């Protein structure tokens, strides 16, 4: 699953997803990105990996949380639509989440290549779904799952 020989897959980071929403996805075994949009899910392939970053614990709380909250592997080719109520029908994709611990971002900032401006590191998260390097992925995941 995370053996060094298996690093040909795409690694993506989803930012700006509150912790409570990430945990719903983890418990349900799915990813839902960019307010339920289909396109970012379609760009992913089986065996690709996703790391969730949560700036807040929930949408109503303004207190910063700023942790990597989940890591998982795309399990199949299917992107599907669900009816979540109140006219909201988001797209989802099946993910096999690893058991991991939530990890603060701050110790990683100096060493993450996708963060170009270390002083204003939050700018790196303005796009919802970004591909990250193998180096960045390994750095984060090794702390989250203690490989």
Curated annotation (Swiss-Prot):
InterPro entries: EVE_domain (IPR002740), PUA-like_sf (IPR015947), UPF0310 (IPR022996). Gene3D superfamilies: ph1033 like domains. Belongs to the UPF0310 family. HAMAP family: UPF0310 (MF_00771). This is UPF0310 protein in gntR 5'region. The gene is oug.
């Amino acid at each position: 699953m995370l053996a060094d020989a298996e690093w040909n897959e795409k690694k993506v980071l989803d930012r700006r997803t509150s912790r409570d929403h990430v945990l719903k996805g983890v418990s349900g075994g799915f990813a839902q990105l960019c307010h339920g949009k289909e396109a970012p899910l379609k760009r992913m392939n089986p065996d690709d990996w996703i790391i969730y970053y949560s700036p807040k614990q929930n949408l109503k709380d303004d207190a910063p949380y700023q942790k990597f909250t989940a890591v998982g592997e795309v399990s199949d080719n299917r992107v599907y639509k669900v009816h979540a109520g109140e006219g909201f029908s988001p797209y989802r994709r099946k993910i096999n989440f690893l058991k991991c611990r939530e990890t603060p971002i701050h110790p990683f900032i100096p060493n993450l290549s996708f963060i170009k401006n270390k002083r204003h590191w939050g700018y790196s998260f303005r796009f919802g779904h970004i591909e990250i390097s193998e180096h960045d992925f390994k750095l984060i995941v090794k702390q989250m799952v203690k490989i």
